[in-house]
C-alpha cells in the first residue's frame, strides 16, 4: 500500500515538473500554445473501413444500472459469458466477446483502457468492478480481427475505453445513489490543471446485500443473496514535454468481493495497475507505452447438496507487464504508415485446497502455474485516393507458453497427479485489409478481411474448476485460436443527424477453445476444429430537436464444427450464444440539464452447454434514466432496471437455475455531471 501511495504522489507531481513555468522567460506573441489532451494518436484515415461504433460519454453515464457492461450493451453482439453483470457473477466468468464468438468465459475481444490491455493476466476476464462510468469519455467498439498494436488479443474485435480529461470533466463531480434493496453507489472525481497539464483523481464504492439469484422454489436455508462490496480508486496525470510530446501516467487500484448462490460461496478480485505513456504529435508521430499489473483472485465452492465448502481457491496471484512502440513516419503521397512492436507477458500461480463434503477434511492441496508471452511486430498503411481509402496491415507474433505445471497432493504430501507442460514457441502471421469508398455525400461502402490470433490463458491451460457438480478439466496442450473473417457494409446518412448502417460478416475461429462435454458432469477444455459465425448487424442513430434514438440489432448463425471427441457437437450452437441480440435507447432533453431516457435490451434463446440440452429462455428488459437539475450543478437522478420484471435466466444446470437482476429502482443526487 505504501508503494501505491508513493506512485499516487508521483502521478500528481508529473504535470508540474514536466512543464514547470520558466519565470525568467518573458511571454510574447511567439510563445507556442501547448495543448495536452490525455489521448492517444488520432484514428487513421482508413479506420472507418472496419465495423466500429462509438459510445459517447452521455450514453455511458446515463445507463439504468450505472455499469460499464450496460453501456457496452448498446452494441448488439457484445456479450459476457453469462447474462449476469458484475454485481451477481463470478469474476472469472466475465470474459467478453463479439459476434457470438463465445462458448468460453475467457475474453475473445481485446479490451484497452487508454491503450493498455486490462484483461486479468491469469484468467482473461475483464475486471468490470474496477471500471467506473464517470471516469470515461468514450468507448469505441470495433468488430472483427485486428493486426495493429496488441492485435494478438483482438480475435473477435477491440473495445477501446478512453478516460475523460479536463475538456470533459467538471472541476469536481460526485454522486450518491441508493436502491430499493438498500444498495448504495458512491463516487467522487476531482480534475484540476497542474502547470500546463492536468491531474484527475477519482474513487468509487458500490455495495449491496444483493438479490436472490435462486428462484424461490429452489431456495434452501443455505441460500444467500448475491452480495457485493466493490471499491476502486484511480489517479491520472498528463503533462506536456516540449511543444509536441505529452506524458501520461495512470494508476488504478481495486478490490471486488462477491457472494453467489450459497452462504460462504465468496469470491474476491483485486489488483493494482500502473502505466506510463509518451505520445508525440510532431512530424514523426509516436505512441510509446509501458504497463505493469498485479492481480489476485480467490473463490470458495460450496456443495449444492450438503452446503459446505468443497474447494477453497485461496490465492491466485498473477502479474501482467508489457509495452508497445508505434511510429507513424511521414511518407507523403496520401499514405499514413504505421510501424511498431509490442510485448506482453503474463505469469501466475494457483493455490487451492479441496475438502470432503462429509468430513470437512482436506482431501487434496493443489498448485498450478506458468507463464505466457507474446512479442509482436506490425506494419500498416492507409492510402487516401480522394473518395477512396485503402488499408492493409501485416503482423508477426512470437508466442511462448512456458513454465507450466499442475500438482495435486494428498494431505500427507504424496503426489496424486502431476503435469509438467513442455515449453512451446510459435510464430504466427496475421493480417487485415479494407477499403472505404464515399460513393456520394450520403453513402459510404466499405469492406474488410482479416486474420486474428488469441493465445490460451493460464487458466485454460492449467486450472481445472468445479461449478458443483460439474467438473471442468484444464488442458496444457491447448493451441492458439486463429480467426479468419470477411465483411461488407453500407453506411447511409439520409439527413443531418440521421445515421444508418448495415454489415454482413462471415467469421471462422479455427481451434476455438471450449469446455467440451465428456460425461454428464465432466468437461474438458479442448480445441474444437472450428466455430463458424455468419450474420448481419444493423445500426441506427437519429437526433431531431430534443429527441434522439440509438439502436443496434444483430443476428448471428454460429455453430460448432466438431470431429473426433467433439463429433457430438457438430452443428450445435456454442454454449451461451444467442442468435438474436438488440439494444435501443430513446432520449428526451427538453432543456439544459434535463434528461429522460428509456433503454430496451433483448437477448435471444441460449443454451447452458454445447449439448443444447439446458435452455435459457429469451429475455427482454426495459430500463429508465431520469435527471432533473436542482441548483447550480446539483441534479436529482432516478434510475430503473428491468421495469417489466422480466425473468432473466443466467444459468440452467439440469434445472438448477440462477436469475438475473429483478425490478430495481435507484434514486440519488449528482453534482458536476
PLM segments and residue spans:
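Short acidic/polar hinge/loop motifs at secondary-structure boundaries
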Residues: 116-143
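Periplasmic-side early beta-strands and strand-to-turn transitions of outer-membrane beta-barrels
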Residues: 147-148, 160, 167-177, 189-269
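Conserved C-terminal beta-signal and adjacent last beta-strands/turns
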Residues: 191, 195, 239, 436, ...
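Gram-negative outer-membrane beta-barrel transporters
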Residues: 384, 390, 498-509, 526-610, ...
